């Protein structure tokens, strides 16, 4: 496992990215999914036109699915809408999207685009170049790249959670929860098929299984901005995530 402790955008200045799949899980995101899809399609059209966009509607009770279908009807990029009903959880949504990916590399990104799309080459190119099997964005390696911080309580809870994850799993990473992770699918498909956590701790499970399988993992600092409307409850979901991590450790 390796970590890049600096932000050097000059390293990622290729004119065009190789084809990859983008997976966006969403639950009741009608207020912003339209803008997110349009921005993603525009980015792919300009930087990787052979790529595909997969939106996973995880049992939304609002117009999320209808909005996605409407935009996809005129898309120039290959698109797919997967529907999970009832809601199964973010982990299940991400897994179903990644396992449906048809490109050699797949990236999942949160629906709020807290990590700007312009950071995409940082996680795609190390995989395309054969350096790693998993590359993921991190807020923990260079906090100066955080533009808009989370509320203080939420940010501290996240830092404590990541410390407990390090202690419980021996994972050497400083931010397992940033929603910006890319996978070399031929290497990662077995761990995705083996994963069982459907909740918010799914990231930890994927990294844990990948490390145990000997895959090459790289944590990379990315720009990040907090967006309002998070579905994560600071207390209840943090406790649920800790229970999932403890169960993961005991099962291993």
Annotate the PLM regions.
Residues 9-19, 163, 170, 194-252:
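Hydrophobic helical membrane-anchoring modules
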Residues 29-44:
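Short, well-formed alpha-helical segments that are part of the catalytic scaffolds
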Residues 29-32, 60, 90, 116:
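Donor nucleotide-sugar binding loop of glycosyltransferases
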Residues 36, 64, 94, 118-120, ...:
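Acidic donor-diphosphate engagement hotspot in glycosyltransferases and nucleotidyltransferases
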Residues 50-54, 65-100:
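Conserved donor nucleotide-binding strand/loop of the catalytic core
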Residues 57-66, 113:
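A conserved acidic beta->alpha catalytic loop
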Residues 84-100, 105, 117-200, 226-236, ...:
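Acceptor/aglycone-binding surface of glycosyltransferases and processive sugar-polymer synthases
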